[in-house]
From Swiss-Prot:
Provenance organism: Tolumonas auensis (strain DSM 9187 / NBRC 110442 / TA 4)
Molecular functions per Gene Ontology: sulfur carrier activity
PANTHER family: SULFUR CARRIER PROTEIN TUSA, SULFUR CARRIER PROTEIN YEDF-RELATED
Name of encoding gene: tusA
Localisation: Cytoplasm
InterPro entries, sorted: Sulphur_carrier_TusA, TusA-like, TusA-like_sf
Magnesium keyword on record: no
Domain of life: Bacteria
Primary localization: cytoplasm
A Gene Ontology BP annotation from the UniProt entry: tRNA wobble position uridine thiolation
Name this protein carries in UniProt: Sulfur carrier protein TusA
UniProt entry tagged with the keyword Cytoplasm: yes
Keywords: Cytoplasm
GO cellular component assignments: cytoplasm
Length: 82
């Protein structure tokens, strides 16, 4: 799956990090973003396949797209109202 550069406001490369670090970095990055902005997350920890979608649901952000067929995994998140 490809993501258009026009769809991405920020990119976070969490490659090489293991749970819980990728989600902690996503949380920190999203907190500094404006509502509606998008974040492309790149990670290679298999736990992110479960953790990133759960984080989005719990924090009311939108997981616009994901590519989890093989590492590196990619997730496109739109910041919600939090």
């Amino acid at each position: 799956m490809t993501f258009s550069a026009d769809d991405i406001n920020q990119t976070l490369d969490a490659s090489g990090l293991r749970c819980p670090e990728p989600v902690m970095m996503v949380r920190k990055t999203v907190r500094l973003m404006q509502e509606g902005e998008t974040l492309l997350v790149i990670a290679d920890d298999p736990a992110t396949v479960r953790d990133i979608p759960s984080f989005c649901r719990f924090m009311d952000h939108t997981l616009l797209a994901s590519d989890t067929e093989q590492p590196p995994y990619r997730y496109l998140i739109r910041k919600g109202l939090n």
